[in-house]
Amino acid sequence: QPHIIQLNTCCPLSAVPHISRKTIVELWFVAELELAQSKLIEIRPKIGAFVSYVNTDIVEQLRDLRCVLEAQLAVEACGMLTKSQLDSLYENIALWEMYIKRGDEEKIFTLDKEFHGSLYKMCGKTVWYNLVESMAPHFDRTTILSFRCKETGRILKDHGELVAAIENKDKEKAAHISQRHMSRYSENIDAIRKHFPDYFND
């Protein structure tokens, strides 16, 4: 089981004027409940809170959902995105290339989230986006782990090809690339399990 989480009330925050230990504890419990609702931690009464294993069932279901939603997004984007919006996506890809060379997985992950989030928002699908994000934490964990054990260039290539297809208004190709992109999880999961077995219990 992943490590138990402990609250350190001697942290620098507790030394800030006007922030009491009681306030810190209350904030911690709120955060703990939110993490538990996202199934990122497991609360065991009288024992403590433990980081949860990766829930592959949630990951698979979210992948299936995103596969459908983002293929439709790609189709709609072909008839909606402006040159300025396309340029913004291309700029994201250019930053990806820079951070791949630097090996900065945190920046790469942030840019990946921004790329997909931008497509939802550019197409006016904020409800879809909020739904996906509400289920995202376990999927995000596997994404980060995949960056640590798999070459990220294929993901970047998918992004570039997707934007090019949208720019060319090729709806069929855009949908195909989007679905292929979401299938990367299935390609990566065996490698993720092999390199990080302690994150799984199924």
Regions found by a protein language model. Give the residues of each.
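Short linear motifs at protein or domain termini
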Residues: 1-79, 190-202
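Conserved amphipathic alpha-helical segments that form helical-bundle/coiled-coil interaction surfaces
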Residues: 62, 79-144, 155-164, 173-184
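Charge-rich, acidic-biased intrinsically disordered regions
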Residues: 138, 143, 168-169, 197-202
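Active-site loop of classical SDR/Rossmann-like NAD(P)-dependent oxidoreductases
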Residues: 151-153
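C-terminal effector-binding regulatory domain of bacterial HTH transcription factors
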Residues: 172-202
